[in-house]
């Protein structure tokens, strides 16, 4: 499953994590993706959406 929001196109970000002794280790930060049923052009469809888009009202859930 792709870790990418279908609304805002938010995806995984790679970077470096620092410990207290300043040792570095590579890691990734993934968005909080939920699989929901949303109305797309009036029909319910399963989409992968981040929680930021859900909370801001960019997606209308299908009931």
Swiss-Prot record:
GO terms for biological process: translation. The gene is rpmB. The keyword Lipid biosynthesis does not apply. The keyword Plastid does not apply. Belongs to the bacterial ribosomal protein bL28 family. Keywords: Ribonucleoprotein, Ribosomal protein. GO terms for molecular function: structural constituent of ribosome. GO terms for cellular component: ribonucleoprotein complex; ribosome. InterPro entries: Bacterial_rp_bL28, Ribosomal_bL28, Ribosomal_bL28/bL31-like_sf, Ribosomal_bL28_bact-type, Ribosomal_bL28_sf. Gene3D superfamilies: Ribosomal protein L28/L24 (2.30.170.40). This is Large ribosomal subunit protein bL28.
